[in-house]
Amino acid sequence: MRCLKSLLAFFTAFPIGGAELSFKCVWALPYVAAPIIAAIPTTLLYLGASPAIAYIALLAATGLHHLDGLADVGDALLVRDREAARRVLEDPRRGTGGIFAVTAVVVTTAAHLHSPLQLLLGEVFSKSTALLFAGFSKSFKPGLGEAFTEAAKRQWPAALPALAVLAYLAPVTTAVSLATSALLYQLAYRHLGGANGDVYGYLLEVSRSAFVIWSAYVPVPTAF
């Protein structure tokens, strides 16, 4: 229970006290963290709130931590030199690349969002993908990203049942979303020479968006 509290304290904005930072339960990301994060946003969407409001609520539930990673990586991708790009990740100032990345992801995702199930499955996909990809990654610096990577190397198989369920419910959407997420992740991973917390935040955001966007175009169950 303590490690689950730690996981939720790190990946959500909910006030969970007395939790020491630990990734021992990182396997629970798709099964515990994702449904909890999506609970309020999906309820809002079900009750008639606009997709934009529901998506903003979901981002708020994550504490905007992953969105910050998206912005940092967006800035870093505009810098050609690897070492300079890594330094950009530490710069608190926001550049054109970061502003564009955040705006593009949020606006396009909200524009393609139209059902609570779509949002819930998108969040499960995001957490599953991050766990899976991190299991085969390396960190380029010490820190939380390194700790997440090391934990994922041991626990990445836990992502497979969640992805299998998604593939059963929406096979084409899941497949093309995995391919899209892999391409976008490799873009940042190769540019920076590895992963860190910002790169994983970027991955969490773009993978969720990929699933939501593709599910609006690819034939999926009528529940969508």
UniProtKB/Swiss-Prot annotation:
GO terms for molecular function: adenosylcobinamide-GDP ribazoletransferase activity; cobalamin 5'-phosphate synthase activity. Its cofactor is Mg(2+). The chain crosses the membrane at residues 21-41, 44-64, 97-117, 156-176. Joins adenosylcobinamide-GDP and alpha-ribazole to generate adenosylcobalamin (Ado-cobalamin). Also synthesizes adenosylcobalamin 5'-phosphate from adenosylcobinamide-GDP and alpha-ribazole 5'-phosphate. It is a multi-pass membrane protein. It comes from the Archaea. Keywords: Cell membrane, Cobalamin biosynthesis, Magnesium, Membrane, Transferase, Transmembrane, Transmembrane helix. Its EC number is 2.7.8.26. The lineage of its organism: Archaea, Thermoproteota, Thermoprotei, Thermoproteales, Thermoproteaceae. Belongs to the CobS family. It catalyses: alpha-ribazole + adenosylcob(III)inamide-GDP = adenosylcob(III)alamin + GMP + H(+); alpha-ribazole 5'-phosphate + adenosylcob(III)inamide-GDP = adenosylcob(III)alamin 5'-phosphate + GMP + H(+). One of its GO terms (biological process) is cobalamin biosynthetic process. It is found in: Cell membrane. Signal peptide: none annotated. One of its GO terms (cellular component) is plasma membrane. InterPro entries: CobS (IPR003805). The keyword Transmembrane applies. This is Adenosylcobinamide-GDP ribazoletransferase. The keyword Cytoplasm does not apply. Pathway: Cofactor biosynthesis; adenosylcobalamin biosynthesis; adenosylcobalamin from cob(II)yrinate a,c-diamide: step 7/7. The gene is cobS. HAMAP family: CobS.
